[in-house]
């Protein structure tokens, strides 16, 4: 009985430590995957990289990071669904971004300035690297 009473606190401690490790590590894996995909995409010489996209970073100052990621996902979806280029990479990036994004957002193209897909991906890569350095 004495050994069991000593093991219970140790097991609880291990369980708590493991859960903290797993939750922190999930953030790292998703961000690592996003950054890896962004590195691959931005190094490509592809005509799709010059396609016009809404400048999702020109949003109001009160926009949250999650809303910005949501808008970026909308633009990525628009590109890979309508232009049939870089689908594998843009689709994967969209899926990973959706795990970091809010569920609903809007991109009002009439009021939004435009940029290129390359610029969007480069800015997104910078943001993700900063986020990863804090994770």
Swiss-Prot record:
Its main location: secreted. One of its GO terms (biological process) is positive regulation of DNA-templated transcription. Residues 1-24 form the signal peptide. InterPro entries: 4_helix_cytokine-like_core, IL-4, IL-4/IL-13, IL-4/IL-13_CS. Glycans are attached at residues 62, 96. Keywords: B-cell activation, Cytokine, Disulfide bond, Glycoprotein, Growth factor, Secreted, Signal. Disulfide bonds join 48-85, 70-105. It is found in: Secreted. One of its GO terms (molecular function) is interleukin-4 receptor binding. Belongs to the IL-4/IL-13 family. Participates in at least several B-cell activation processes as well as of other cell types. It is a costimulator of DNA-synthesis. It induces the expression of class II MHC molecules on resting B-cells. It enhances both secretion and cell surface expression of IgE and IgG1. It also regulates the expression of the low affinity Fc receptor for IgE (CD23) on both lymphocytes and monocytes. Positively regulates IL31RA expression in macrophages. Stimulates autophagy in dendritic cells by interfering with mTORC1 signaling and through the induction of RUFY4. This is Interleukin-4. The gene is IL4.
